[in-house]
Amino acid sequence: MSEERETVLITGASSGIGEALAWVFAEHGYDMILVARNAQKLDELADEVAAKHDVMVIVRPMDLSEPDSASNLARVLHREGERVDILVNNAGVLEHGAFIDIAPEDHQRMVQLNVAGFTNVLAHFVPDMVAREAGKVLNVASIGAFQPIPSLATYAATKAYVLSLSEALAEELRGSGVSVTALCPGVTQTHMVEEAQEQSEGVRKLPRMMIGDVETVAREAFRACMKGTPIVVPGTLNLAGTLAARATPKWLVRRLTGLMGRSTL
């Protein structure tokens, strides 16, 4: 990588918010290391980004739900002399539906990637940032992290973990030179949401105004990450809903999200 430019590592970079963030970071002159399972999409994205913005891009196809994947990634990058200045911890998977209708292996896959894989990436890259007294972390949670969501029960629970760990880590690292930002987007027009729309008539019927633009979300996330803002909720409606949920008794929030969740099944 270039000695003059900083490098961002983006997981889940082959589509959705991860891909959009790759374009935004490239616009601002960052070299990047892109990680995802789909090697073909990573290669295509890397070629397009490098050609348009004259940045250096490394691709590392891998499945971060595998227990040793984060350690293998860290070891390879260390051996190659690559420094990670900014970590975008975005890789995740979503399964929509009633809890009992989702296969046990799909619940496990969400926990393995959204919780275990997410944590392993942090554990292998944050210590080096702290040692250098410089770095930024952008963890991708969800607006679903703020309350339980029937029909997305396991997914929302994993994102609550992401938000909780992000907030705790932000405080632990206060004054260290390393900032931690939790991105909590609402429903965003990504491949993941498109799959949910295919599975659920209720999701398909969501008003267009409730579905965020992925590029807009990525730009808000970039700005918050640069500032070191602990939590960012893109979109006025999403932010208002989040603030309202935090001020509402939990039993009522559960009842309301239950009604909404059943309407999307």
PLM regions and their residue ranges:
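C-terminal helical subdomain
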Residues: 182, 204-241
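Residue(s) in the substrate-gating loop at a strand-loop-helix junction
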Residues: 142
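Conserved glycine-rich Rossmann-like NAD(P)H-binding loop of the short-chain dehydrogenase/reductase
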Residues: 28-45
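Active-site helix of classical SDR
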Residues: 122, 158
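Conserved glycine-rich cofactor-binding loop
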Residues: 14-16
